[in-house]
């Protein structure tokens, strides 16, 4: 094929991609997000994330609470769950009994014990990177970059958890102060989800102004809808599995991790769709991998 013919093919390819982008922007946002979720097999991805959350993040949160409480016999990591979900008696007693007291975890606070859970965080971050790459229609990074970027993302996520917990669970506040603290805790979450595509997506740093808008998806879903839903449905899950004792608490946690996993996949899809609709067409076309949906 001559150079002129190749140039014509490139031009036709670009025109087709611009046409597909224009057509995609005409679809209702909710329908576009649903289509993207199905396109990347979001249900399966969410289930995988839920298992990794249950086996990695929850143990690290428990060990971290125990460490900062001085492994006290009168402290229970279940307190975090109780305060986060606003549980009341008799559910509070069940949760405390299921988690035990902090002194029981003293032997877990070793380099090998903590490092084991941290290492498991790397596969989780690589999974999240794959989800975002698919949702944003980008080619994934090579293995070395995926490991480095995934580790950075995972450490940033743990930092955000600590900061948010410090803000919202730092004291027994009520009324306007509690509302202000809740709003303040949304800021690091917004920053985190705005930076996630930059870390995990190829060419993810393009259109930074529009990434800030995409980051709002994380604020709405991860920091608002999921916590509110947790306070409504988690107590019902615990009550429904009352006869199973500690296993019932574990099953409720696993179920909730499943919803969080789905929420994260939806966050990736919503952020991608928002970015594609608000960023300049040239930026979107230059950044995306040439993938024909379906």
Regions found by a protein language model. Name each.
Residues 1-294:
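Membrane-embedded alpha-helices and immediately adjacent juxtamembrane helical segments
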């Amino acid at each position: 094929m001559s150079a002129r013919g190749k140039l014509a093919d490139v031009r036709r390819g670009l025109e087709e991609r611009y046409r597909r982008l224009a057509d995609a922007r005409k679809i209702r946002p909710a329908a576009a997000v649903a289509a993207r979720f199905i396109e990347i097999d979001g249900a399966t991805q969410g289930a995988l994330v839920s298992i990794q959350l249950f086996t990695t993040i929850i143990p690290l949160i428990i060990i971290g609470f125990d460490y900062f409480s001085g492994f006290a016999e009168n402290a229970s990591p279940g307190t975090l769950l109780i305060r986060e979900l606003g549980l009341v008696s008799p559910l509070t007693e069940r949760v405390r009994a299921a988690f035990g007291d902090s002194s029981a975890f003293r032997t877990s606070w070793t380099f090998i014990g903590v490092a084991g859970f941290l290492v498991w965080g790397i596969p989780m971050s690589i999974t999240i990177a794959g989800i975002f790459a698919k949702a944003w229609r980008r080619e994934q990074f090579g293995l070395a970059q995926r490991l480095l970027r995934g580790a950075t993302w995972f450490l940033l996520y743990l930092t955000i958890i600590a900061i948010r917990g410090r803000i919202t669970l730092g004291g027994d506040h009520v009324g306007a102060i509690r509302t202000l603290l809740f709003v303040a805790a949304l800021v690091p979450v917004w920053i985190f989800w705005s930076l996630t595509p930059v870390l995990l997506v190829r060419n993810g740093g393009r259109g930074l102004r529009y990434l800030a808008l995409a980051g709002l998806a994380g604020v709405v879903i991860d920091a608002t809808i999921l916590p509110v839903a947790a306070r409504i449905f988690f107590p019902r899950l615990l009550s429904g599995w009352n006869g199973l004792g500690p296993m019932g608490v574990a099953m409720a946690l696993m179920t909730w991790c499943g919803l969080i996993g789905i929420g994260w996949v939806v966050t990736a899809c919503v952020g991608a769709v928002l970015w594609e609709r608000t960023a300049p067409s040239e930026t979107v076309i230059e950044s995306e991998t040439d993938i024909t949906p379906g």
